[in-house]
From Swiss-Prot:
The lineage of its organism: Bacteria, Pseudomonadati, Pseudomonadota, Gammaproteobacteria, Enterobacterales. It comes from Photorhabdus laumondii subsp. laumondii (strain DSM 15139 / CIP 105565 / TT01). It catalyses: shikimate + ATP = 3-phosphoshikimate + ADP + H(+). Keywords: Amino-acid biosynthesis, Aromatic amino acid biosynthesis, ATP-binding, Cytoplasm, Kinase, Magnesium, Metal-binding, Nucleotide-binding, Transferase. InterPro entries: P-loop_NTPase, Shikimate/glucono_kinase, Shikimate_kinase/TSH1, Shikimate_kinase_CS. This is Shikimate kinase 1. Disulfide bonds: none annotated.
């Protein structure tokens, strides 16, 4: 990969965007950003609190602004929030400003990876987690697919293996 281009990771919660993103950035000697962590850094509060106080709409506005600013940088790896693709503006910016990698995973794997995580506001509801994740998948998977340059399934693979697969695919293109 001669020139440094941006790599944007999209996919559902629990797909491994943050873990794989850190690994990928380290291997490629690029800066890593996580849009949720950036929102937390800027607000001084965790994502769940922002969701509670501002609602999903307020959170998505912050997310859109953060992603817009981060995607203007060069040579970064960005792990986006699972719902960031709901914004057409964000989808357009991700597509225009870098390579979009869709990290795909099964509902079963999402459940296993997120079951004890209290920092997932969309799972802090009365409905069963499986039902919530299935509804989110039905809504968002077509949006991930719409903007993906590359799709990789992360089930049963380490972050390093997935990062290597991404690097291989990028070197071919």
């Amino acid at each position: 990969m001669a020139e440094k281009r941006n790599i944007f990771l999209v996919g559902p919660m629990g797909a491994g965007k943050s873990t794989i993103g850190r690994q990928l950035a380290q291997q490629l000697n690029m800066e890593f950003y996580d849009s949720d962590q950036e929102i937390e850094r800027r607000t001084g509060a965790d994502v769940g609190w922002v969701f509670d106080v501002e609602g999903e709409e307020g959170f998505r506005e912050r997310e859109e602004k953060v992603i817009n600013e981060l995607t203007e940088k060069q040579g970064i790896v960005l792990a986006t929030g699972g719902g960031s693709v709901k914004s057409r503006e964000t989808r357009n910016r991700l597509s225009a400003r870098g390579v979009v990698v869709y990290l795909e995973t099964t509902i079963e794997k999402q459940l296993a990876r997120t079951q004890r995580d209290k920092k997932r506001p969309l799972l802090q509801v009365d409905a069963p987690a499986r039902e919530v994740l299935e509804n989110l998948a039905n809504e968002r998977n077509p949006l991930y697919e719409e903007i993906a340059d590359v799709t990789i399934r992360t089930d049963e693979q380490s972050a390093k293996v997935v990062a290597n697969q991404i690097i291989e695919l990028l070197e071919k293109n």
